[in-house]
Amino acid sequence: MATGPTYRVKFRRRREAKTDYRKRLKLLLSRKPRLVARRTLNHCIAQIVLYDEKGDKTVVSAHSRELIKLGYKGHTGNLPSAYLTGYLLGKKALAKGYTEAVLDIGLHRATKGNAIFAILKGALDAGMEIPHGEEILPSEERIRGEHIKAYAEMLKEQDEERYKKQFSKYLEKGLEPEKLPEHFEEIKAKIDSMF
């Protein structure tokens, strides 16, 4: 560790790898609400956050657990659930009068077509205005879960036992992974009917 008079200790949240202050400052200078998109292995979280001197204020939020209450039977950490979480957030935000935002991905890596950008695509399709590049968004097939369907069909054909093990939670909940795209459309329609 460096010592001496020229050494400066970084801010606590930077040391804990929670905040990139340079990126945060650039986002705050836009003076727009931030669409904060975060992903864990099993869940997706999306929030509309406003800056305040005493601490940021979350005005609208959506969590992939809310999809379960709507009847979603798929995994809550995959690409279709990330899109639906963003879509739900977008509908909630528009209902509260927030029409535009800037995307805040925090310390997540900006990889083309990942779940963070599926959240963004969901918010855009709900009607929000968020600056973005079209090439970064995931394809419609991946958003609907066509890649999961194709993998499930291939696995069921080749190794029935592995198929049952891989998709045990889907089957336990009564959803065949081959029907995920249709199930996705049902949940999206339910979100539309709420607003």
From Swiss-Prot:
GO molecular function list: 5S rRNA binding; structural constituent of ribosome
Cleaved signal peptide residues: none
Keyword RNA-binding included in the entry's annotation: yes
UniProt GO cellular component terms: cytosolic large ribosomal subunit
Keywords from the named record: Ribonucleoprotein, Ribosomal protein, RNA-binding, rRNA-binding
Keyword RNA-binding recorded: yes
InterPro entries: Rbsml_uL18_euk (IPR005485)
GO biological process: ribosomal large subunit assembly; translation
Pfam family, one: Ribosomal_L5e
Role played: This is one of the proteins that bind and probably mediate the attachment of the 5S RNA into the large ribosomal subunit, where it forms part of the central protuberance.
Subunit annotation: Part of the 50S ribosomal subunit. Contacts the 5S and 23S rRNAs.
Family: Belongs to the universal ribosomal protein uL18 family.
NCBIfam families per record: PRK08569.1
Protein name: Large ribosomal subunit protein uL18
